[in-house]
Every structure is written in structure tokens, then in C-alpha cells.
């Protein structure tokens, strides 16, 4: 069952200007160390940061809060599986909110899709809840 959907569109050039203006202050406030390493190792650094920015915005919308109720940027982290598929990990208040949304006897799964086409980066997040029995069978 779907328990949350969020989408966001970010301007890559705006993120690039923000990186130039605020540098590490911006990076450290919004992105985890792992996200920073990933983006800084890419040729299209600003596009990588913009996609992750959009993913965090989309996730906060899927959680039904936006960036309120104590949820901070670094409570949501985009990571990639070995296949390259993006995933979202939540901690802190974002994890608490996810727990509140997840029905008893279910496990939450966060699905993430990222894309960019200069000057835009887009993210789409769907949070679903699957019964624990189904989760155990698919593991």
C-alpha cells in the first residue's frame, strides 16, 4: 500500500551558485558525508547535489511534513545500491515520522527515482508499506 508520494524539481544552476557562495557551510548543513563524497567525485557535481536536494525535498513531502516537525536535511540520505539504483535512508525525526506512518505489521519501503536534464534535476519518492510476511519472503 502507498503511504506517501513526493516529488520535487530543483534548478541545477541555482544549486551550483549556492555551492559557490556558501561552499562547505551549505554542503555540511544539507548533505551527509557519504553524499558529499559521491557528488564531489562526479564530473557533474552540481547536478549530483541538485538531484539529492530534490530527493530530500520529495522525501519530506512523502512523509507529509515537508521540512518541519523537527525533520532536518541530514535526516534523509540518498545512497546508491551496487546496481546504481538510488535509495533513501532516514534517521532522526524523519525515521520517527516514517514509523508513525507505517501501519502495524508492515515494513516501510522508500522508492526513489532521480533524473536530470540541465538545468533541471527531478526526484520522485514513493513510500510503500508491505506486510511483514511479504517482506520476509522477498528477503
Curated annotation (Swiss-Prot):
Q: Which reaction does it catalyse?
A: apo-[ACP] + CoA = holo-[ACP] + adenosine 3',5'-bisphosphate + H(+)
Cell compartments where the protein resides: Cytoplasm
Q: Keywords, A to Z?
A: Cytoplasm, Fatty acid biosynthesis, Fatty acid metabolism, Lipid biosynthesis, Lipid metabolism, Magnesium, Metal-binding, Transferase
Q: Which SUPFAM superfamilies match?
A: 4'-phosphopantetheinyl transferase (SSF56214)
- Recorded GO MF terms: holo-[acyl-carrier-protein] synthase activity; magnesium ion binding
Chief subcellular location equals cytoplasm
User: Know the name of this protein?
Assistant: Holo-[acyl-carrier-protein] synthase
Biological process according to GO: fatty acid biosynthetic process
Role description: Transfers the 4'-phosphopantetheine moiety from coenzyme A to a Ser of acyl-carrier-protein.
A GO cellular-component term linked to this record: cytoplasm
> Does the keyword section mention Zinc?
no
Record family assignment: Belongs to the P-Pant transferase superfamily. AcpS family.
The enzyme class is transferase
Q: What is its EC number?
A: 2.7.8.7
Positions bound to Mg(2+): 8, 57
Q: Which cofactor does it need?
A: Mg(2+)
Q: Which gene encodes it?
A: acpS
Q: Which organism is it from?
A: Dinoroseobacter shibae (strain DSM 16493 / NCIMB 14021 / DFL 12)
**UniProt-listed InterPro entries:** 4-PPantetheinyl_Trfase_dom, 4-PPantetheinyl_Trfase_dom_sf, ACPS, Ppantetheine-prot_Trfase_dom
